[in-house]
A protein has these predicted regions:
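Substrate/ligand-engaging "lid" and interaction regions
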Residues: 78
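Short active-site segment of divalent metal-dependent hydrolases/proteases
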Residues: 81-82
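Acidic (Asp/Glu) carboxylate-rich active-site/surface patches
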Residues: 1-75, 85-90, 94-173
Length: 173
């Protein structure tokens, strides 16, 4: 395959098909051999996007294993804002459709406020179920941060409708 006769927009359409079909290795190799800077930029973008897809796919490893065991409704639970000095703890439980790709998905502490907002909106729109709980500082002071977080996780899980068949918890032991 030779891409030198293609316009940059045609190369872009081939590398990033609107219908999400898989791109052939022949096309990728042909693009790598294309001397045009515009095509080189597209190849770098393609490689970045593929690396991000692989990173996010690795996050779903436990969920996929649960699905392979026959569980259809798998919830993920996590907290943010931990710390008795920092104020309340927010806990959320979410059941996402299998195979949903959320680019930029990462630990909330590792992403910007803008990305968190974008992900929040997309999760609210596409999730099968979402439940969130805010554990206040008084509760944290009364029972300790670990117990307050665990209680918040249970409350968030029991707030899901439909109820999950399996729960994956990101917790400190």
């Amino acid at each position: 395959m030779d891409t030198s006769g293609m316009k940059i927009r045609e190369v872009e359409a081939a590398l990033f098909p609107a219908d999400g079909t898989e791109v052939s290795q022949d096309l990728i190799e042909a693009c790598r051999l294309d001397a045009r800077q515009g095509v080189a930029r597209l190849v770098r973008r393609y490689e970045r996007e593929q690396a991000e897809r692989e990173r996010v796919a690795a996050l779903y490893a436990y969920e996929n294993a649960a699905a392979d065991e026959g569980y259809e409704l798998v919830a993920g639970v996590d907290e943010a804002g931990r710390g008795p000095l920092a104020g309340p703890v927010s806990v959320a439980a979410v059941i996402l459709p299998r195979g949903l790709f959320l680019p930029k998905l990462n630990d909330s502490k590792k992403i910007s406020a803008n990305v968190r907002e974008e992900l929040y909106d997309e999760i609210q729109e596409k999730a099968i179920a979402v439940s969130s709980v805010l554990v206040d500082a008084k509760t944290i002071d009364r029972v300790n941060i670990y117990q307050a977080t665990m209680n918040g996780m249970y409350e968030a899980i029991f707030g899901l409708d439909p109820a999950p068949q399996k729960v994956l918890i990101d917790a400190v032991h």
